[in-house]
Design a protein with these regions (language model features):
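Sec-dependent N-terminal signal peptides
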Residues: 1-4
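Early extracytoplasmic/lumenal segment of secretory-pathway proteins
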Residues: 14, 18-86
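C-terminal motif of bacterial Sec signal peptides marking the signal peptidase cleavage site
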Residues: 9-12
Length: 194
């Protein structure tokens, strides 16, 4: 069995344009299982600020729920491309990092990565860095796996699972075909679909 593992290429947290009204509560929207409940409890104990923590599965799910306006979020943790989209739509607020003691300890390379979607580093704070890869059971797959091509090998039909991520579903075939992961060419995107 093959498993495509993907951790978000780059995840940033940003302050949404729709803040909650309660000054003693911070409403956070993040991927499921990304922050342990004990961390939230420790934060509440140390600061006296209550955390209302909401989870989502994919950035697209997050976007749909956010845009519905049902809940106003103070902090949203999502992927790089979604931060950029929401900035372009005016849905993100600038973050004052001067009061964040740890901000000066963030390695410059991560702040530089953020500049790809937040050129002035004013809207997002680096949160997670991840990767995409292939995990496989060596008892089932005997040959060495060193290429994305194994995903299209007929002998492994119905034995491959992939994370529920629209972006990753396109990223893998684009990468395999030597196409930029950020292409906007309809021809290249259709090639990735086939």
């Amino acid at each position: 069995v093959l498993l495509i593992i993907s951790t978000i290429a780059f995840t940033g947290c940003f302050s949404s344009g729709k803040k909650s009204d309660d000054k003693n509560t911070v409403t956070v929207f993040n991927y499921g299982d990304y922050i342990d409940v004990s961390v939230l409890k420790t934060f509440e104990k140390e600061t006296g600020i209550k955390v209302k923590y909401e989870e989502y599965v994919t950035p697209e799910d997050m976007y749909t729920k956010y845009k519905s306006g049902v809940i106003n979020y103070d902090v949203i943790c999502t992927s790089d491309y979604m931060v950029e989209k929401m900035m372009q739509e005016g849905e993100a607020q600038k973050i004052d990092t001067s009061s964040m003691e740890y901000y000066k300890n963030i390695d410059e390379k991560y702040l530089d990565f953020c500049k790809a979607f937040d050129p002035t580093n004013e809207y997002a704070v680096p949160y997670l860095w991840g990767t995409v890869g292939i995990l496989y059971n060596t008892k089932v797959i005997k040959e060495k796996v060193d290429s994305w091509s194994i995903l299209w090998d007929k002998k492994y039909d119905d034995q491959i699972v992939m994370q529920n991520s629209m972006r990753d579903a396109f990223m893998v075939p684009l990468k395999w075909n030597g196409i930029s992961l950020n292409t906007t060419s309809q021809k290249e995107l259709k090639q990735a679909q086939s």
